[in-house]
Structures are given as structure tokens and as C-alpha cells.
Amino acid sequence: MGNMFANLFKGLFGKKEMRILMVGLDAAGKTTILYKLKLGEIVTTIPTIGFNVETVEYKNISFTVWDVGGQDKIRPLWRHYFQNTQGLIFVVDSNDRERVNEAREELMRMLAEDELRDAVLLVFANKQDLPNAMNAAEITDKLGLHSLRHRNWYIQATCATSGDGLYEGLDWLSNQLRNQK
């Protein structure tokens, strides 16, 4: 009984929690984004084999962010992280025009999974600081985001190294969580 009141109190006044899965092709900037959000600084990264997981506190929400490696050989493992995921962050290297179709295929494959049917989608169009980077509208088109029905999605132009756009993305996620019944 006491536990019920504690949960009610936490629900009304305490932190909300959101489980986030962050994926994307290798070298898109996922790990850099994770640690920029967690530590506020740029860290030296190596390709992620497996995953990194961190809790990021922002606006009274505790985001548990799973950063899963994006190399093609380990992408089949992404599905093991789908369960209970409320938000999906898909990171795209906006400068990598050659692999944007590959990114689209991976994104659409994931969104077809039953375990992710209720997850909201945030796309980070990363590396906007590079001179040849596609803007958010172009990434939206290339990923086919307008074709998504029955799913809340948002695209945010970002630069992981400066932090530009990252918190705007978290704002959108936190608003989505607040609007869930």
C-alpha cells in the first residue's frame, strides 16, 4: 500500500523516466552525442562494439540512453534493445551522402518492428558544421520521413561537437513523454 502511494507521489511530483535507444550507421556521432549530453564535453571515441548506456537528467526527466554500435555486422543486435523503448533517436551523418539510402533502409527496417510500434522517433541530422552537410529538410526527404503514418517523429539539425540542437531534441522527447497518457 505504501509503495502505491510512493509511486503516485513520484508520478505527480517526481522525475519521469524515459528509455531511449540511440542508433544509426557507424560513425554518425552517436557516442559523441551521448557523452556531450552526459558530460557536456567532447570525448575521444572509438567505434562502439556493443553499447554504452548513460542516464541523462534534463528538465525533471531521467533519460536512460542506450547508444548501440552501428557497424553493419552488429546492426542485427539492435533488436535486442527494442523492448520497453519509448523513444528512438536515429542519428544520421548529414555529410555522408553516399550512405543516406543505407540509413533509410535500416531506419525503415527498425520502424517495422512490432516492439517499436509505440516509440516516438527523433532524428538527429548530425554534423551540420561540415560544409557539405545536407540540411534537415533534405534528410527528411532522403529518409522518407513524410511517409511515416501513425508515428510521432521529429528531425533536429545537430552538431555533436558543439552541442547545437541536442537539447532541442531532448525538449521534443520530454514533451512527447508529458503528452503520453
UniProtKB/Swiss-Prot annotation:
Catalytic activity reported: GTP + H2O = GDP + phosphate + H(+)
Sorted UniProt keywords: ER-Golgi transport, Golgi apparatus, GTP-binding, Hydrolase, Lipoprotein, Membrane, Myristate, Nucleotide-binding, Protein transport, Transport
Main location: Golgi
PROSITE patterns cross-referenced by the UniProt entry: ARF
GO molecular function annotations of the record: GTP binding; GTPase activity
Alphabetized CDD domains for the sequence: Arf1_5_like (cd04150)
Any Pfam family hit: Arf
InterPro entries (UniProt xref): Arf1-5-like, P-loop_NTPase, Small_GTP-bd, Small_GTPase_ARF, Small_GTPase_ARF/SAR
NCBIfam families for this protein: small_GTP
Family statement: Belongs to the small GTPase superfamily. Arf family.
Protein name: ADP-ribosylation factor 1
Organism encoding this protein: Xenopus laevis
Taxonomic lineage of the native organism: Eukaryota, Metazoa, Chordata, Craniata, Vertebrata
